[in-house]
């Protein structure tokens, strides 16, 4: 029993210590002129289901300040923005936009939004109608 208490104390102490390693996270400034332009229905879906990882308008939940969750969330957002950042869409070349739309076409049926994200943010779930609308909007039917 003493060993269990000792292990618990060390784990608790470690958990408390890692809280000192905070992620310095801020959204970059948003320039609406650089944002993606899409029909209202498409923008609604993108903002609801994609913007928390793929824009400069991330709304962090309360648990985003708890390590190690904060580290993983920061990593996911950084990776998401590298893949596509809807806040800077107009800075992409036509070729980059075309490629990103093609990837969006594929990913809305395969992996996005991530299941772990949807589990914590049920409103972000895409319906079949949402998925079809996004795919139709991209204009990237399979070759």
Task: Tell where the protein language model's regions lie, with residue ranges.
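Hydrophobic membrane-insertion alpha-helices, especially the h-region
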Residues: 6-22
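Electrostatic cytochrome c docking/interface patches
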Residues: 26-46
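The canonical Cys-X-X-Cys-His
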Residues: 46-57, 112, 134
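Sec-exported extracytoplasmic/periplasmic mature domains
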Residues: 51, 55, 78, 106-109, ...
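Short cysteine/histidine-rich zinc-coordinating motifs and their immediately flanking basic loops
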Residues: 62-68
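Extracytoplasmic electron-transfer domains, predominantly the class I c-type cytochrome c fold
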Residues: 71-120
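C-terminal capping alpha-helices of c-type cytochrome domains
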Residues: 110-111, 118-143
């Amino acid at each position: 029993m003493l060993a269990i208490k000792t292990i618990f104390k060390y784990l608790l102490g470690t958990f408390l210590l890692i809280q000192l390693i905070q992620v310095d996270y801020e959204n970059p400034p948003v320039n609406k002129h650089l944002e993606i332009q899409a029909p209202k229905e498409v923008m609604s879906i993108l903002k609801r289901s994609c913007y928390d990882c793929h824009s400069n308008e991330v709304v962090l939940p309360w648990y985003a300040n708890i390590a190690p969750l904060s580290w993983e969330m920061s990593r996911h957002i950084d990776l998401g923005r590298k893949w596509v950042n809807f806040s800077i869409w107009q800075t992409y070349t036509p070729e980059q936009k075309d490629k990103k739309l093609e990837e969006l076409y594929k990913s809305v049926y395969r992996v996005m939004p991530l299941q772990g994200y949807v589990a914590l943010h049920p409103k972000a779930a895409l319906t079949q109608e949402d998925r079809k609308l996004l795919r139709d909007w991209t204009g990237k039917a399979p070759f």
